[in-house]
């Protein structure tokens, strides 16, 4: 399947005095922590992140327009491609099914909490509602929606990326159907036996 954007398109090297947070597993790399960017990667692309001494820390997606310049996705030396995103989504969906097997309306993906910074996916009975809060997730929208719908066994998807935080990523607010329109008034939410 491969990455819709490409593999590592660059290397972000951190300042020696500013790499401890990323090495400790924090998913955000601020612009002030970066020493250099090699390879001229486009914003939104997957980059390798290295310590000040040059050792591998992880991989994430870059956005120079944001104060959070890199959002780390993994601290393993593994490719971050469409299959990687599919596995991470599958892990999140399985976890929800494990802790709340009867839930038909719940948060399936909660951004950094599920290792997918900038992505929120909620299920409302037969519909998935997406928020793409960062450029790195927004440009992968098609594969994230398609994979999520396949995993959930659903067809209906709606986007609610109408939040102000997108402006910090250089993105416009978005709201609307993802795919064929559907009658949202037919969706009835049930929780603990109540509708």
What are these regions (language model features)?
Residues 1-125, 149, 175-186:
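Non-catalytic accessory regions of SAM-dependent methyltransferases
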Residues 111-116, 120-122, 140-195:
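Non-catalytic substrate-recognition/targeting regions of SAM-dependent transferases
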Residues 61, 133, 162:
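Surface loops and adjacent helix of pleckstrin homology
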Residues 135-138:
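Helix N-cap motif at beta-to-alpha junctions
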């Amino acid at each position: 399947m491969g990455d819709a954007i490409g593999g590592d398109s660059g290397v972000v090297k951190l300042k020696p005095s500013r790499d401890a947070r990323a090495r400790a597993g924090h998913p955000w790399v601020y612009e002030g922590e970066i020493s250099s960017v090699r390879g001229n990667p486009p914003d939104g692309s997957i980059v390798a992140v290295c310590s000040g001494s040059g050792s591998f820390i992880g991989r994430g997606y870059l956005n120079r327009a944001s104060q959070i310049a890199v959002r780390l996705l993994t601290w393993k030396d593994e490719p971050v491609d469409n299959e990687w995103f599919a596995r991470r989504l599958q892990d999140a969906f399985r976890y929800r099914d494990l802790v709340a097997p009867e839930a038909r309306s719940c948060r399936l993906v909660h951004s950094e909490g599920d290792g997918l910074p900038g992505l929120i996916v909620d299920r409302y009975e037969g519909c998935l509602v997406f928020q793409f809060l960062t450029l790195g997730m927004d440009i992968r929208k098609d594969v994230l929606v398609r994979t999520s719908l396949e995993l959930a066994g659903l067809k209906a998807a709606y986007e609610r990326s109408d939040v102000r935080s997108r402006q910090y990523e250089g993105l416009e607010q978005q709201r609307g159907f993802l795919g064929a329109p559907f009658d949202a008034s037919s969706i009835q939410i049930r929780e603990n036996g109540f509708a």
